Amino acid sequence: LLAVCLSGCMTDVQSVQCRRVNSLSPFGPAVMEEQGVGLSIKAFEQGVEDGSLAGHVGFAESVGMIAEALGWKVDKFEQQMKPIVTTVDRKSPYGFAKAGDVAGVNMTGQGYVNGELKIDMIHPQQIEPEMEGTHTGDYIVLKGTPNVSMAINPEVDGGIGTIAMMVNMIPHVINARPGLKTMLDLPVPRAIMGDMRDMIEK
């Protein structure tokens, strides 16, 4: 959604790249398991093949939403899931990966329009990324007129960001007309510092 908002000051958009580099360290055992933290490379590859590893979920939906907002028709979507292998032992509160094993997953996804790559999603996530010099952050690059780029360092904390978004959208969801809605249908998210009841339409 942030990429869509940034495109509002552009007269044309040629491509969109969204990259989120984040730490899995704050998350619990369920996330460690679904991201393959601590697995051997062979076990990780087997999990990708049999579908037991979730990795990041939502690239197809994000690509679809960006395309819909910009008026593009995606004719092909691809997604990849690769292990991030650590060269040092890494330990987080709920995860451990010894050197040579998997510390996280690098998810990538692409949306093509008329055979041309238009939407590029990149999402490496791992425990204790700083131990090998990786700094977290959220990055958006829009190519077009004018070019637009955005960087947030360090990353927006995934847990806090999710909780805040859900709470801040409460009055907008209440005010929405009945039906299935996406974030494109609702007002731009914002922190609500006042009384939410004042925002409910009578």
List each language-model region with its residue ranges.
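Active-site-lining helix/loop region of Rossmann-like oxidoreductase modules
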Residues: 4-138, 163, 168
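Short glycine/serine/threonine-rich phosphate/pyrophosphate-binding segments
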Residues: 1
